[in-house]
Amino acid sequence: MMAMNSKQPFGMHPVLQEPKFSSLHSGSEAMRRVCLPAPQLQGNIFGSFDESLLARAEALAAVDIVSHGKNHPFKPDATYHTMSSVPCTSTSSTVPISHPAALTSHPHHAVHQGLEGDLLEHISPTLSVSGLGAPEHSVMPAQIHPHHLGAMGHLHQAMGMSHPHTVAPHSAMPACLSDVESDPRELEAFAERFKQRRIKLGVTQADVGAALANLKIPGVGSLSQSTICRFESLTLSHNNMIALKPVLQAWLEEAEAAYREKNSKPELFNGSERKRKRTSIAAPEKRSLEAYFAIQPRPSSEKIAAIAEKLDLKKNVVRVWFCNQRQKQKRMKYSAVH
């Protein structure tokens, strides 16, 4: 009974001996005292309540120090190193400033936001650690959020003013892409026009493909007849059609110019044998060929070469003569039967 009635002094934390709103302590010291776990004494039954009041008062004092720190010089490096050692987990969102243009454009806003961002980052966890209720914890981010939005607006404005050239390439890209890509309808019209002009000039698709090498265009050689055919029938890929169009257009312009000027340029047509005259075989050579045909109507390639060399004729001429002679014999037999 005596023990219960006796007045025992409550165990007080050493922090209570110091004035609550002392202006002698810096913000970093206040944060250290709030974040460091204080030993819970068994004799103090109101310990947690006192600590929450103390933490709330010290947090308000720290915010007050920040507001007063705007008017007098402040060393951010000392606060940064001291606060980095505080074992508090940051749950608040900060806006990192990593662009040098923003710092040079608005130095006052950048330094002010950096200092307050550092302090508020460590203040908000202390409010949750010290045991404040949900309404107080949700009020602080609501008060801080407009400041961050304003700082972000200044940051984006500074970045836009410092780097106006970064917007220009993006606006110019669609124009470049439109120049590179060609309209499919234009390709179709050119393919049809090319086909009609080629036929009017009397040039085959194979002649066009072979004559492209004579244009002396860098990186362009002769093409096959199937490639020209696929271009005219629009069965090539879109990229190949775009790449082949200027080459065929250059050939067509030169071919039409040569045709108008009546200038003989066989390399454009690749037609040295395209317009050769009808071959006429003299009577002595013709009698010799008829004699060979009577012996062997289907001579081998080696035999045709030997006959051509002996009669001083081209091998192709001898081969075609034997082929025509066989067709003539078939017609004669067919007419005799019927």
From Swiss-Prot:
Outcome of swapping E232K: In DFNA15; uncertain significance
Location of the motif POU-IV box: 56-65
Residue ranges annotated for the POU-specific domain, each copy included: 179-256
Tissues in which the protein is found: Brain. Seems to be specific to the retina.
GO CC terms in record: chromatin; cytoplasm; nucleoplasm; nucleus
GO molecular function: DNA-binding transcription activator activity, RNA polymerase II-specific; DNA-binding transcription factor activity; DNA-binding transcription factor activity, RNA polymerase II-specific; RNA polymerase II cis-regulatory region sequence-specific DNA binding; sequence-specific double-stranded DNA binding
The keyword Ribonucleoprotein is annotated on this UniProt entry: no
Record GO biological process: axon extension; inner ear auditory receptor cell differentiation; inner ear morphogenesis; neuromuscular process controlling balance; neuron apoptotic process; positive regulation of transcription by RNA polymerase II; regulation of transcription by RNA polymerase II; retinal ganglion cell axon guidance
Keywords, ordered alphabetically: Activator, Cytoplasm, Deafness, Differentiation, Disease variant, DNA-binding, Homeobox, Non-syndromic deafness, Nucleus, Transcription, Transcription regulation
SUPFAM superfamilies documented for this protein: Homeodomain-like, lambda repressor-like DNA-binding domains
Cited CDD domains: homeodomain
UniProt keyword DNA repair, yes or no: no
Location(s) in or outside the cell: Nucleus; Cytoplasm
Principal cellular location given in the protein's record: nucleus
DNA-binding feature ranges: 274-333
InterPro entries on file: HD (IPR001356), Homeobox_CS (IPR017970), Homeodomain-like_sf (IPR009057), Lambda_DNA-bd_dom_sf (IPR010982), POU (IPR013847), POU_dom (IPR000327), POU_domain_TF (IPR050255)
Associated disease: Deafness, autosomal dominant, 15: A form of non-syndromic hearing loss with variable phenotype in terms of age at onset, levels of progression, and shape of audiograms.
Family of the protein in this entry: Belongs to the POU transcription factor family. Class-4 subfamily.
Record text on subunit structure and interactions: Interacts with ISL1.
Job of this protein: Acts as a transcriptional activator. Acts by binding to sequences related to the consensus octamer motif 5'-ATGCAAAT-3' in the regulatory regions of its target genes. Involved in the auditory system development, required for terminal differentiation of hair cells in the inner ear.
Protein name stated in the entry: POU domain, class 4, transcription factor 3
Organism expressing this protein natively: Homo sapiens (Human)
Lineage: Eukaryota, Metazoa, Chordata, Craniata, Vertebrata
Gene symbol of the encoding locus: POU4F3
